[in-house]
Every structure is written in structure tokens, then in C-alpha cells.
């Protein structure tokens, strides 16, 4: 029973996922600090408020807090896209560009048979 669990945990996908979660948590703290401490300070100087939490309050409905969450999400998404996704895509494209093109696949048995039939038909016509 424990041997099967050990095999499951030691598979590459589980280890990669665990590392990704840990790195994602650490990166999330960095991005949250960037948003809350730097970018929202810039928003505060432009708009006059550090966030929108108290802007639109209708009783228990805090629409401003929802708007602040959306702004944070958009900033975090843009930061992740431009700081992680774009460089990884460019690196992947660069490595693909430097790889030799794959060799064409060998003809299948069906293709060989069709080629023989074609050649025989050409011989009968001439």
C-alpha cells in the first residue's frame, strides 16, 4: 500500500505540481506587494484614493471593494502575462527555431501499395 503511494508521489508530474504551487505562492506575495504597495499608490495619486473600497457602498453591498478586487486581478494578470508568459513563449519559440526540422515519416504500407499500383497503371498506358 505504501509502495504504491510512494510511486505516485515520486512521479514527475506530482513533484512538478508541488514545486509549482510553492513557487506560485511565493510569486503571489511578490505580485501582491507590487500591486498594493506600488501600483495602487500610483492609482491613489492619479485618482485621489488608494482604493475603491469606500467609493460605492449601498448598505451591505460594497461595490467599490468589488471594483478594487477587479483592478487588482487585472494588474496581477497583466504582470503575470508580461513577466512570465511572454518570456517563456519567446524562449520556447527560440528553442523551436534552433531545432532541426523533423524527418518526414516513412511511407506506410498503404502508401507503398498505392505507389506500386500507380506505377503499374503508368506502364500499361504507355
From Swiss-Prot:
Keywords: Cell membrane, Ion channel, Ion transport, Membrane, Transmembrane, Transmembrane helix, Transport. One of its GO terms (cellular component) is plasma membrane. InterPro entries: Mechanosensitive_channel_CS, MS_channel, MSC/AndL, MscL_channel. It is a multi-pass membrane protein. It is found in: Cell membrane. The chain crosses the membrane at residues 14-34, 66-86. GO terms for molecular function: mechanosensitive monoatomic ion channel activity. SUPFAM superfamilies: Gated mechanosensitive channel. Its main location: membrane. It comes from the Bacteria. Homopentamer. Belongs to the MscL family. Channel that opens in response to stretch forces in the membrane lipid bilayer. May participate in the regulation of osmotic pressure changes within the cell. This is Large-conductance mechanosensitive channel.
